[in-house]
Amino acid sequence: DAIISTLKKHGIKGGFFFTGEFYELYPDVVKRLLDEGHFVGSHSYGHLLYMPWEDRDSLLVTREEFENDMMKSYETLHKASIEYKDAPVYIPPYEYYNKEISAWAKNMGIQVINYTPGTMSNADYTTPDMGQKYRSSKFIYDKIMEVEKKEGLNGHLMLMHFGTDDRRTDKFYNGYLDKMIKTLKRKGYTFVP
């Protein structure tokens, strides 16, 4: 609710990408997002890991498994009144894919998209027990502002997780999201889904 409320407060429409399980568990959230005019798309059905972390050129899924997972994802979108043609882009699980996955998606009429690396906005899922991989909300905010100062953020896609582990009590969307939007609006940025 914090993300939706913050975006509404600032008159911003966002893009939300969920797994099939999320669509099944939280249809009321999906309906609210649609009613408020946000883009809602696929993040796969089962959040499969497509390839090993150590070898991006190999695969852990077959084309058939990939296509079945994506079709199941789009079936859940359809149940939420989102038609295939209205959700032509998707963010792969773990934001991790290769050219083969991109080609398979393209053959299904789906375009792979991903966040712009560098801002660390995607690190809002990390928890303190992850040691050096943990990124506090202040760190993420400061990194976004650092990138903005060095190169600007025009065209950047920032990824923030709709929900995070309870072990992360420092939720970016509880304060820093609002602060970031205010700061970027003051600098003349506009936001698009």
Residue positions per predicted region:
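Acidic-and-aromatic substrate-binding clefts and catalytic sites of carbohydrate-active enzymes
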Residues: 1, 17-27, 90-99, 133-137, ...
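Active-site beta->alpha N-cap acidic-glycine motif
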Residues: 1-58, 71-88, 180-183
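Terminal accessory/targeting
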Residues: 4-15, 28-31, 119, 130, ...
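Structural recognition of the beta-strand scaffold that forms the well-ordered cores
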Residues: 14-18, 39-42, 86-92, 111-115, ...
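Solvent-exposed loop/turn segments at secondary-structure junctions
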Residues: 21-24, 39-40, 45-50, 94-99, ...
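Acidic/histidine-rich helix-loop elements
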Residues: 50-64, 125-137
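Non-membrane alpha-helical structural segments and their capping/turn regions in soluble enzymes
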Residues: 60-68, 134-138, 170-174, 178
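His/Asp/Glu-enriched short active-site or ligand-binding loop at hydrolase and phosphoryl-transfer sites
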Residues: 101-148, 189-193
